[in-house]
Amino acid sequence: MDSIWGNYRRWNNLTGWFLFVFSAIVYMLTLEPTVSFWDCGEFILSAFKLQVGHPPGAPLFIMIGRIATLFAGGDVSKAALMVNILSGLCSAFAIMFLFWTITHLVRRVFLNNFQLKHF
């Protein structure tokens, strides 16, 4: 019983991290190196200058984006690239955690409905 459960946990964790790496690679390969349409420019500027974006804003993203813009090394032209890389990594983490949430909920429903003793 423990070996089956441990095997499931291992494969679940590995699959989640694989999805993170795969989606991060896809996001990085299709990354916009400058400002794109809609609110991207406002969020990049807000992160670079550490200002408030339009309400309701995204204060945590703005603060983390400011840290990301510091990796540009003072080059203003690279600030947009750094914030876009941050957005890609955040999206990849969201995909990984969404996978883990779905597998957790499905496992809960599966175990509660069928009462299998193997899991």
Question: Where in the sequence are the language-model features?
Answer:
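Membrane-embedded glycan-lipid processing machinery
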Residues: 68, 79-89
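Short, Lys/Arg-rich, polar N-terminal cytosolic tail immediately upstream
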Residues: 1-10
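Transmembrane signal-anchor helices characteristic of membrane glycosylation enzymes that use polyprenol
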Residues: 9-37
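Membrane-water interface at transmembrane helix exits
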Residues: 26, 31, 65, 69, ...
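Transmembrane-helix motifs of polytopic, lipid-linked glycan transferases
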Residues: 17, 85-114
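Juxtamembrane helix-capping/reentrant segments at transmembrane boundaries
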Residues: 48-49
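Transmembrane and membrane-interface helices of multi-pass
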Residues: 21, 115-119
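Extracytoplasmic catalytic/substrate-binding loops of multi-pass membrane glycan-assembly enzymes
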Residues: 31-43, 53-65, 81
